[in-house]
Amino acid sequence: MTTTTSVLHTSALTSLPLLARGKVRDNYAVGNDRLLMVASDRLSAFDVILGEPIPGKGALLTQMALFWFDKLGSICPNHLTGEAPESVVTAAEIPQVAGRSMLVKRLKPIPVEAVVRGYLAGSGWVEYQQSQSVCGVPLPAGLKNASKLPEPIFTPAAKAEVGEHDENISYEQVVKVVGPELAAQIKTLSIAIYETAAAFALTKGIIIADTKFEFGLDENGTLTLMDEVLTPDSSRYWPVEGYEAAFAAGQNPPSYDKQFVRDWLEAVRINGKPWDKTPPSPHLPPDVISKTAAKYQEAMARLTA
């Protein structure tokens, strides 16, 4: 596995035009048909970019995404070009991209987050308690926080601008945005990818509770998997050995993802008051940063063991 030792909060490539900075990735144009996606070490929680980077995070996210793109290639085409990211920047810029970047096809993005849930957690659990459904999908009575669902469900979200909250939407709303044929294709493909990945992860002692996919259309109109896939930033990763006890106690299972930081941010008090989830975020203490970095490393090590 390639890793970089330097910490990168924000890339600063001058040889390519910057198109956008997302919560984690900086995207640069390479001609008219490709993008260079640089995964920084930034961390976002509650749709706010935190001030402190997590050392090694960008490289780990990139290696994990490449691992899954390779494993899922038979199910769905992806946006990778197969070319080395280092080939499109100057020699001086290589340290900023090595091990943490992907050179990808430029696609027409679909403005829907394709979320699949195999377990009830996070915003899904909150919504279930109010309506016994998630995104309009009715669920059985009596489920608890972190319950395994009878079968995975497709619970899409509207893609938000940076700094805005993604909003859960119904399948019918997806149909309105992309049409019935493409909506059905996205739903079927998302569930198939999730089921394949979740079954594999389980053999490594990891529960993928839920995940978020992003798709685009290529020049031929082919639905193509893009952005990141099945990383701890886009998924809830739970180690199997901590799940049963937490579930029985009605608690969030221990996780390999950002939940650790989310829980700390929920508990922290600023002048005696909870953080209101708007910028600026509270400063993460060094032990939270190091524990978060260790969780990303452990997830990758376990998955690829």
From Swiss-Prot:
EC number: 6.3.2.6
GO cellular component, one term: cytoplasm
Catalytic activity entry: 5-amino-1-(5-phospho-D-ribosyl)imidazole-4-carboxylate + L-aspartate + ATP = (2S)-2-[5-amino-1-(5-phospho-beta-D-ribosyl)imidazole-4-carboxamido]succinate + ADP + phosphate + 2 H(+)
Pfam name, any one: SAICAR_synt
Keywords recorded for this protein, A-Z: ATP-binding, Ligase, Nucleotide-binding, Purine biosynthesis
Enzyme class: ligase
Listed pathway(s): Purine metabolism; IMP biosynthesis via de novo pathway; 5-amino-1-(5-phospho-D-ribosyl)imidazole-4-carboxamide from 5-amino-1-(5-phospho-D-ribosyl)imidazole-4-carboxylate: step 1/2
GO molecular function terms attached to this record: ATP binding; phosphoribosylaminoimidazolesuccinocarboxamide synthase activity
Keyword Nucleotide-binding recorded: yes
Family: Belongs to the SAICAR synthetase family.
Protein name per UniProt: Phosphoribosylaminoimidazole-succinocarboxamide synthase
